[in-house]
Amino acid sequence: MARFRGSNWKKSRRLGISLSGTGKELEKRPYAPGQHGPNQRKKLSEYAIQLREKQKLRYLYGITERQFHNTFIEAGKQSGVHGENFMRLLARRLDAVVYALGLARTRRQARQLVGHGHIEVDGKRVNIPSYTLKPGQVVSVREKSQKLDIIQESVEINNFVPEYLDFDEEKLSGTFVRVPERSELPAEINEQLIVEYYSGK
């Protein structure tokens, strides 16, 4: 399945979650396109609810179904709660950490920065957005990329970095201190529904 490239605003309203991270999509019309008010959403089947939750998380991270499912399978091989492990693995993606550090305004921008070779891990260029970070690794902007407007503007407006990361604004680098707790990850996602979705297939 291809990565979604359509209107994030319509997709955000349909799923009831801000895919841009700004929340602007839901400010005026916090209901799905085609509805004429917030109370007209039709009742969904159990399967449809599970599918919708899966799509919410997949579109939030902007990854293909294959990448998403492979990460889900990998999470199932770890000890602990499957759904929480899955959420943590997604948060450990390099593009997700670049976004969380505030080096990009959106996850899509973060993915592009990585893919275009502007990001290093432990001093070596890594251009794979799905690269999984380990505690202690350092994510930084390549020296010749540090003056890019997209990065400078993102850092300037960002006012929050999660506690599982340690960011040095002057050096434009951040350390992946530890694996995040579930409480530090998107609260609007019910990952158990996603586990149930794949379990039923």
Curated annotation (Swiss-Prot):
The keyword Aminoacyl-tRNA synthetase does not apply. Pfam families: Ribosomal_S4 (PF00163), S4 (PF01479). GO terms for cellular component: small ribosomal subunit. InterPro entries: Ribosomal_uS4, Ribosomal_uS4_bac-type, Ribosomal_uS4_N, S4_RNA-bd, S4_RNA-bd_sf. PROSITE patterns: S4 (PS50889). It comes from the Bacteria. Keywords: Ribonucleoprotein, Ribosomal protein, RNA-binding, rRNA-binding. One of its GO terms (molecular function) is rRNA binding. Residues 92-155 form the S4 RNA-binding domain. One of its GO terms (biological process) is translation. One of the primary rRNA binding proteins, it binds directly to 16S rRNA where it nucleates assembly of the body of the 30S subunit. With S5 and S12 plays an important role in translational accuracy. Belongs to the universal ribosomal protein uS4 family. Part of the 30S ribosomal subunit. Contacts protein S5. The interaction surface between S4 and S5 is involved in control of translational fidelity. This is Small ribosomal subunit protein uS4.
